[in-house]
Amino acid sequence: MEWLVKKSCCNKQDNRHVLMLCDAGGAIKMIAEVKSDFAVKVGDLLSPLQNALYCINREKLHTVKVLSASSYSPDEWERQCKVAGKTQ
């Protein structure tokens, strides 16, 4: 399943991003913590590869590794963005 990045918080020191993801219909569904050497921006499309890897905007050389994922809630989003001083 492909995911659209709705919001992103990042910690540039360790290349970790917390992403708010929505489905093709635009409904917010997930919060995912990912690691990537590439910037992940609002509006990017994440397409599945294998082993918890997703490519950014169908560019197979630009990947993110999913570290964790949970169902979306406003409280959980805020908590994860604040953990480790991540900024939006």
From Swiss-Prot:
Gene3D superfamilies registered for this protein in UniProt: 2.40.50.650
Record note on what altering D14N does: In strain: ECOR 53, ECOR 59 and ECOR 60
Mutation effect (C81S): In strain: ECOR 53, ECOR 59 and ECOR 60
Keyword terms, alphabetized: Antibiotic resistance
One BP annotation, GO: response to antibiotic
Pfam families: PmrD
Effect the entry attributes to changing V83A: In strain: ECOR 27, ECOR 33, ECOR 38, ECOR 39, ECOR 41, ECOR 44, ECOR 45, ECOR 47, ECOR 51, ECOR 52, ECOR 53, ECOR 54, ECOR 55, ECOR 56, ECOR 57, ECOR 59, ECOR 60, ECOR 61, ECOR 63, ECOR 64, ECOR 65, ECOR 66 and ECOR 69
Outcome after substituting A84E: In strain: ECOR 28 and ECOR 30
Keyword check for Mitochondrion: no
Result for mutant: N11D: In strain: ECOR 46, ECOR 48, ECOR 49 and O2:HN / ECOR 50 / P97 / UPEC
Induction remarks: By PhoP.
Protein name, per record: Signal transduction protein PmrD
Species of the source: Escherichia coli (strain K12)
GN (gene name): pmrD
